[in-house]
């Protein structure tokens, strides 16, 4: 039986360590981008974002302007609807939770693990969500993994999920920025994006993330493509090198 693998891209600096040959291989695989990964000029099959104005708007803008065939998922933990710039509302394949009626509804529940009283236990949430909903645990990573399982993944490979208080991939090195980021660098005409997110990734408490991954690992095989990821060093997940199309001959 063929096992389905989905690759999930975050924004850690290890994204810059992926080789051209590995990117070529990844273009043939099923992929999910989330958070600010859209700043990388790489088309994923699916994209997940939640909350705020700048992040989902920037992702939608990038998907549309590059004519990517990407299905866009939005999750909402706020009372107010997520705002995606009107220019792009009707141009992307999009599912959105708890918001407007111009797209399909993809219902879900998201909360942060450091809240005093999570509304449900992990067991209850998984039973309610893993077939047809999304949930998050301490941010977007768990929602992206949950999305992968909804899409039928037996195995998830994490790329750019470093959790080592390093930099974002787009703050260092040459990463071939997207059209959106090039415009952002030139001072976007969309005022809130002029000085948007660009700083070191800091995790004051990674335990909710590691605890969540330990639990979800009971249901899906999770590995990391970065040997220096905190998740690998703490033994939460195993390291697995990203393949290429080249045949290695010893």
Where are these regions (language model features)?
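Metal-ion/cofactor- or nucleotide/acyl-coenzyme-handling active-site neighborhoods
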Residues: 1-250
